[in-house]
């Protein structure tokens, strides 16, 4: 048997803020989930994403502590166009989420930006640049 990636799990400090952020990115998160300690949503292709509060993680791993220093996890969202990268970046930063890299035309042929989620983790927004289309 070959293992297969089935779920991406995120540990969050504020469930409602995290779910609101990822809803803005188009994830279909249940509307009544904001006060739940564990939430899952289906992703295209059968993959799942899950959010757990810090308390949930500590309930089965009492030694768990939040990471310090640089965050090593990043999620990347493919946008339909370079204009959508710019618009989504403006929407998220306008809603108070910190921008890490303003939209720019990356040398690898993408319009690319990074905004931080409520726990300070980078979320990339990208689309093939107009020249690469």
Q: PLM features: residue spans?
A:
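Glyoxalase I/VOC metalloenzyme domain signal
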Residues: 1-6, 11-33, 43-98, 116-133
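Active-site/ligand-binding-proximal alpha/beta "capping" segment
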Residues: 98-104
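Short, small/polar residue-rich loop motifs at catalytic or cofactor-binding pockets
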Residues: 107-110
